[in-house]
């Protein structure tokens, strides 16, 4: 017999559920874990775009520019942009046989 067995019995007022050993610590722990899992799953589905975008892009920020003069910030931006700007002649086509 399982610890999580539920028995439904008809009564005068309708159907009621009598759980065997509902005060067992294992049943209580399983119920708490189940409820927490459900809450976390619902939050994940509601906020998955925010959460995963934060994890994907939030940790890839550039170095802090606090205390750096504006001229050096602009020079850094230009270096970063020139590293990104590559014309099509620099790409190599690789053909697999």
Curated annotation (Swiss-Prot):
- Tell me the GO molecular function terms: monoatomic ion channel activity; proton transmembrane transporter activity
Q: Does the keyword Lipoprotein apply?
A: yes
**Keywords carried by this UniProt record:** Disulfide bond, Host cell membrane, Host membrane, Host-virus interaction, Hydrogen ion transport, Inhibition of host autophagy by virus, Ion channel, Ion transport, Lipoprotein, Membrane, Palmitate, Phosphoprotein, Signal-anchor, Transmembrane, Transmembrane helix, Transport, Viral ion channel, Virion
- Keyword set includes Metal-binding: no
Residues bearing Phosphoserine? Answer: 64, 82
Q: How does it sit in the membrane?
A: Single-pass type III membrane protein
Residue spans, topological domain Intravirion:
44-97
Predominant subcellular localization, coarse grouping: virion
Q: Where is this site: Seems to be involved in pH gating?
A: 41
The annotated modulation of its activity is: The M2 protein from most influenza A strains is inhibited by amantadine and rimantadine, resulting in viral uncoating incapacity. Emergence of amantadine-resistant variants is usually rapid.
In the record, which residues receive a covalent lipid, type S-palmitoyl cysteine? 50
Family indicated by similarity: Belongs to the influenza viruses matrix protein M2 family.
Record comment regarding domains: Cytoplasmic tail plays an important role in virion assembly and morphogenesis.
What protein name is recorded for this chain? Matrix protein 2
Source organism (scientific name): Influenza A virus (strain A/Turkey/Ontario/6118/1968 H8N4)
């Amino acid at each position: 017999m399982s610890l999580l067995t539920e028995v439904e019995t008809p009564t005068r007022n309708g159907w009621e559920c009598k759980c065997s050993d509902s005060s067992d610590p294992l049943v209580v722990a399983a119920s708490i874990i189940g409820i927490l899992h459900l809450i976390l799953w619902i939050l994940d589905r509601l906020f998955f775009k925010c959460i995963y975008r934060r994890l994907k892009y939030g940790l890839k920020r550039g170095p802090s520019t606090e205390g750096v003069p504006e001229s050096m910030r602009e020079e850094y931006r230009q270096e970063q942009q020139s590293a990104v700007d590559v014309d099509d002649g620099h790409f190599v086509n690789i053909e697999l046989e």
